[in-house]
Amino acid sequence: MSAIFAERALLPEGWARNVRFEISADGVLAEIRPDANADGAERLGGAVLPGMPNLHSHAFQRAMAGLAEVAGNPNDSFWTWRELMYRMVARLSPEQIEVIACQLYIEMLKAGYTAVAEFHYVHHDLDGRSYADPAELSLRISRAASAAGIGLTLLPVLYSHAGFGGQPASEGQRRFINGSEAYLELLQRLRAPLEAAGHSLGLCFHSLRAVTPQQIATVLAAGHDDLPVHIHIAEQQKEVDDCQAWSGRRPLQWLYENVAVDQRWCLVHATHADPAEVAAMARSGAVAGLCLSTEANLGDGIFPATDFLAQGGRLGIGSDSHVSLSVVEELRWLEYGQRLRDRKRNRLYRDDQPMIGRTLYDAALAGGAQALGQPIGSLAVGRRADLLVLDGNDPYLASAEGDALLNRWLFAGGDRQVRDVMVAGRWVVRDGRHAGEERSARAFVQVLGELLD
């Protein structure tokens, strides 16, 4: 058992002073005592917050972040960006994927993300053939997460088709493609090694355009009822139009009419949800997986978060393509997008919580923990000891009390104010540095040179 002491910490019931945390040998919060003494405990140097879950990641895309910002096509969109992504995928080796993921996860930790849901769809070799171990690339992701020290929910993706109605996959998708049987075998292969590594597993459909209704039914009936379920949905208007041409229904409308969507589900993006779909999402308890920096980068649109939150909807944040790795930026732009859409200020709040920063942080913690299916998201007994410490010497934060501190950090601060980060009771970032960052950066630079020559 170890102990840490915070002069102020955000607990489920609110801010508390002089908080002593007792942490078990397996990294779980065993006892939490406000108004306690620091005898024998490690004193922390700033306000303590729960670590933030990142509910949507494509690790390999970090290697191409910033490379698609070149004008030339007046109709540039997600679909043209995707062609660049396919060219990157066509070159990646297993070793390169592991290096990229490790570097990414270290950067996430330094920003205050303490767990990630990896939406992993690169399964096969350069020719589209299965590796000798079909789980080769999935296990590379697991090893990278372990090396970095971040919590992981691995989401191996079922990806079978190029478009609605079972259209044949394209050449650029050859590394992604599995049938339902191979996918279920992959899930079974991954359970034991992920559990041994302390990681979690989830079900994942790439999108309604990449799987058939029968495949969804087959996977959901296969007995993995304990796992979260993720899917990309309604990210682009073209997807909505294509789904209507195929089925006569919008993507979310089709999903809710044909599948029992519940709290296990994370609906990634859901950008183009209409009012009826927003209401269905809120009623079901599913999490809206919002990736603000990526959605802006791709020109996707703005999710109706104000309406969704007002109906009790649950949401979380993800860095997706990793053009940004900032808890602050994702949450700030979640609010700012609604302001730009509505041309009004202070949009995302609860009747009992007028502080925007607190509303955003609480919502993303709860939604992220639900989407990852892990015991995280709050500083409570029985939860994993995932936390971050903000800079106690920063004048803006040191002068702010209670929820005003979150407003200061999220709307006027940045990642540099994250000083220390703990995952499962182990410090992975101290004074803004990760022990493996220099070694990882050298390997990452080498990989970038290989990919971009």
From Swiss-Prot:
<comment type="function">
    <text>Catalyzes the hydrolysis of N-formimino-L-glutamate to N-formyl-L-glutamate and ammonia.</text>
</comment>
<feature type="binding site">
    <location>
        <position position="209"/>
    </location>
    <ligand>
        <name>N-formimidoyl-L-glutamate</name>
    </ligand>
</feature>
<feature type="binding site">
    <location>
        <position position="206"/>
    </location>
    <ligand>
        <name>N-formimidoyl-L-glutamate</name>
    </ligand>
</feature>
<feature type="binding site">
    <location>
        <position position="320"/>
    </location>
    <ligand>
        <name>Zn(2+)</name>
    </ligand>
</feature>
<dbReference type="GO" id="GO:0050416">
    <property type="term" value="F:formimidoylglutamate deiminase activity"/>
</dbReference>
<feature type="active site" description="Proton acceptor">
    <location>
        <position position="269"/>
    </location>
</feature>
<protein>
    <recommendedName>
        <fullName>Formimidoylglutamate deiminase</fullName>
        <ecNumber>3.5.3.13</ecNumber>
    </recommendedName>
</protein>
<dbReference type="GO" id="GO:0019556">
    <property type="term" value="P:L-histidine catabolic process to glutamate and formamide"/>
</dbReference>
<keyword id="KW-0378">Hydrolase</keyword>
<keyword id="KW-0369">Histidine metabolism</keyword>
<comment type="similarity">
    <text>Belongs to the metallo-dependent hydrolases superfamily.</text>
</comment>
<dbReference type="InterPro" id="IPR010252">
    <property type="entry name" value="HutF"/>
</dbReference>
<dbReference type="InterPro" id="IPR006680">
    <property type="entry name" value="Amidohydro-rel"/>
</dbReference>
<dbReference type="GO" id="GO:0019239">
    <property type="term" value="F:deaminase activity"/>
</dbReference>
<dbReference type="Pfam" id="PF01979">
    <property type="entry name" value="Amidohydro_1"/>
</dbReference>
<dbReference type="InterPro" id="IPR011059">
    <property type="entry name" value="Metal-dep_hydrolase_composite"/>
</dbReference>
<feature type="binding site">
    <location>
        <position position="58"/>
    </location>
    <ligand>
        <name>Zn(2+)</name>
    </ligand>
</feature>
<dbReference type="InterPro" id="IPR032466">
    <property type="entry name" value="Metal_Hydrolase"/>
</dbReference>
<keyword id="KW-0862">Zinc</keyword>
<dbReference type="GO" id="GO:0046872">
    <property type="term" value="F:metal ion binding"/>
</dbReference>
<dbReference type="Pfam" id="PF22429">
    <property type="entry name" value="HutF_N"/>
</dbReference>
<feature type="binding site">
    <location>
        <position position="121"/>
    </location>
    <ligand>
        <name>N-formimidoyl-L-glutamate</name>
    </ligand>
</feature>
<dbReference type="InterPro" id="IPR051607">
    <property type="entry name" value="Metallo-dep_hydrolases"/>
</dbReference>
<feature type="binding site">
    <location>
        <position position="61"/>
    </location>
    <ligand>
        <name>N-formimidoyl-L-glutamate</name>
    </ligand>
</feature>
<feature type="binding site">
    <location>
        <position position="235"/>
    </location>
    <ligand>
        <name>N-formimidoyl-L-glutamate</name>
    </ligand>
</feature>
<comment type="subunit">
    <text>Homodimer.</text>
</comment>
<feature type="active site" description="Proton acceptor">
    <location>
        <position position="320"/>
    </location>
</feature>
<dbReference type="GO" id="GO:0006548">
    <property type="term" value="P:L-histidine catabolic process"/>
</dbReference>
<feature type="binding site">
    <location>
        <position position="56"/>
    </location>
    <ligand>
        <name>Zn(2+)</name>
    </ligand>
</feature>
<keyword id="KW-0479">Metal-binding</keyword>
<dbReference type="InterPro" id="IPR055156">
    <property type="entry name" value="HutF-like_N"/>
</dbReference>
<dbReference type="GO" id="GO:0019557">
    <property type="term" value="P:L-histidine catabolic process to glutamate and formate"/>
</dbReference>
<feature type="binding site">
    <location>
        <position position="82"/>
    </location>
    <ligand>
        <name>N-formimidoyl-L-glutamate</name>
    </ligand>
</feature>
<feature type="binding site">
    <location>
        <position position="232"/>
    </location>
    <ligand>
        <name>Zn(2+)</name>
    </ligand>
</feature>
<comment type="pathway">
    <text>Amino-acid degradation; L-histidine degradation into L-glutamate; L-glutamate from N-formimidoyl-L-glutamate (deiminase route): step 1/2.</text>
</comment>
<dbReference type="GO" id="GO:0005829">
    <property type="term" value="C:cytosol"/>
</dbReference>
